[in-house]
Amino acid sequence: YHLLYANLPLQAGSRTLGEFDFLVQDRKTGKTLHWEIAVKFYLGVADTSQAANWLGPARQDRLDIKTRRLLSHQSKLSRYPEAAELFERLGIRVDETWLILKGRLFYPARIKADQPQGAFRQHLRGFWLALRSLPLLESSLWLPLEHRQWLAPLAGVDPATCLDSAALMEKWRHTGPQHPVCVARIVEGMEVERGFIVNDEWTVPDTRSLQ
């Protein structure tokens, strides 16, 4: 693929209608494609077969809301009359729109849970665990991850940078994490599992304000 434009705004006068994430050209077919791309991480609660029960770690986002916006708004940007005018000025014609939603779904630990309807069967998976359930963590080495480390699996990890299960439990015994913490289980320097540790209050989130 050849990148034509990234983060291209679509405007009507002084008003911004939206933004094209990527306009690319397929080198094999010659087609111009509009890509809308999102990378998200969601934790499943209650009936995990329902997209509305998959929440972002900060509880400010939901899987159903994100997919609905992708389908109802972002996928239709190239159909706007203003888009036709923009493409004419740029000398391009958009042939197809692709919606690409990547990321990982984190299932309740030690509980059999269904994947959300419409999810790719081989999607990336993880677990989530409340602070009070930390004793359920498998005895191993764990590495708390910075946000920038959430995307790619880890390799070549120095064991000295990790915490064993007991140290991890001791770290949060009294106060708990202020925000959900993503952790990776490390075996022989390689990541073999990933999950979120959340405080006990997170486990009964109020999602009524998310619409």
Language-model regions: role of each:
Residues Y1-Q211:
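Intrinsically disordered, low-complexity Ser/Thr/Pro/Gly-rich regulatory segments
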